[in-house]
């Protein structure tokens, strides 16, 4: 977080997280293994060392292994492309000098690759905190405009602690001079 007296900037980490690297690698290795086992059962040539995949019948085991391997390789390709393109990264800039809030994110390649939202500070109604506990906890901060749009300000990934999210939301609300919603 970069803060001056009148300007506050939050960097947002995109898809280049350690967990994404881990899962993209694991899925790629698993997919390649399944694909090579299926191909070995068809060609009757051992393509994967330390296995006896030539003993498998191509129909139905080998073809299913090839299908699952291909699906996993495609999913892994998608994950690697989101990492390379750094989808979701960007920054939130709150500038009281010129009265603007800028939300900048990188998207998928194409005409809408760069997502840049600008709002005047006087058009902002509140800072909203949404906390949902359970199996998949959700702790997010939203910028709520006067026309009731809610723009997420927090990054995807590990949820922040309750103390962190309350502190950050309270600071933003005070910095922008708006009310804080969702904290009881």
From Swiss-Prot:
Q: Which Pfam families match?
A: Ycf4 (PF02392)
- Cellular localisation: Plastid, Chloroplast thylakoid membrane
The biological process GO terms on file are: photosynthesis
Q: Where does it sit, as one GO cellular component term?
A: photosystem I
Organism name: Gracilaria tenuistipitata var. liui (Red alga)
Query: Where are the bilayer-spanning segments?
Result: 21-41, 63-83
Where's it mainly located? plastid
The root-end lineage is: Eukaryota, Rhodophyta, Florideophyceae, Rhodymeniophycidae, Gracilariales
Family to which the UniProt record says this protein belongs: Belongs to the Ycf4 family.
Protein name per UniProt: Photosystem I assembly protein Ycf4
- Recite the UniProt keywords alphabetically: Chloroplast, Membrane, Photosynthesis, Plastid, Thylakoid, Transmembrane, Transmembrane helix
